[in-house]
Amino acid sequence: MKILAIGNSFSQDATRYLQEVSASAGEPLFVRNLYIGGCSLEMHANNIKSNEPAYQYQIDAVGVQKISIPEALKLEDWDYITVQQVSGRSGKPETYEPYMAFIIQTIRDACPKAEILLHRTWAYEIGSGHGNFPAYNRSQLEMYGAIVAATNEYAAKYKLRIIPVGDFIQLLRNTPPFDFKSGGMTLCRDNFHLSLDYGRYAAALCWFKFFTGRSAMDVTFVPENTYFSCTNAIKKAADLYL
């Protein structure tokens, strides 16, 4: 199974552990990420038009070459290709078009057998100083709700399935030990990107379950310097809610 993410640092977060997670469960996934930090749908569309080799072609969050989107689409026989809006605009549906239509048509023309998926990303951490947080009144719940509404709208419009990472992260934020508002650990490393341990692990498990349908308990891989109680809590939540 070959998966290409057309994204930014948030798809980098989500795919960092996905190959290791899936391989440890005996169902290895081939995963690549097209990375430009802070890349919006508008920028992706412009880069397609220019055929600019502006992207890091990443394996496990490490760039191995520079590439354009048209080149990447032809590089493998992709089974799935994911798209997403940049985080600050992810809950602003008016920012998706006309770029979403152009990107989807480009993918369908180049990879007619691939299923296009929409990656629902997460809201910023409570108290985040991100410059786009005021657009959501600095409210995590308002931002999360806006992301859900926008992604639902475009998933319905283009008949896309959603990878619900944003839902899973929000759910974990209301469970111990990740209830940050009550003194628990944050799932973010800088109040918006996912933490390098539990946040990225949770996202990888979400993608793993989406693509394989397998139990998270089949996964034996865990990131370094993590506590069993925490990784096990994420696995249990994944099986219960995803």
What does each model-identified segment do?
Residues 67-196, 209, 218:
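Alpha-helical cap/lid subdomain in secreted, periplasmic
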Residues 11, 15, 100, 144-148, ...:
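A structural signal for well-ordered alpha-helical scaffolds and beta->alpha junctions
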Residues 20-21, 172, 216, 226:
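Alpha-helix termini
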Residues 2-4, 10-97:
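Conserved SGNH/GDSL esterase-like catalytic core that processes O-acyl groups on lipids
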Residues 184-187, 191-242:
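Conserved catalytic region of serine esterases and O-acyltransferases that act on ester linkages
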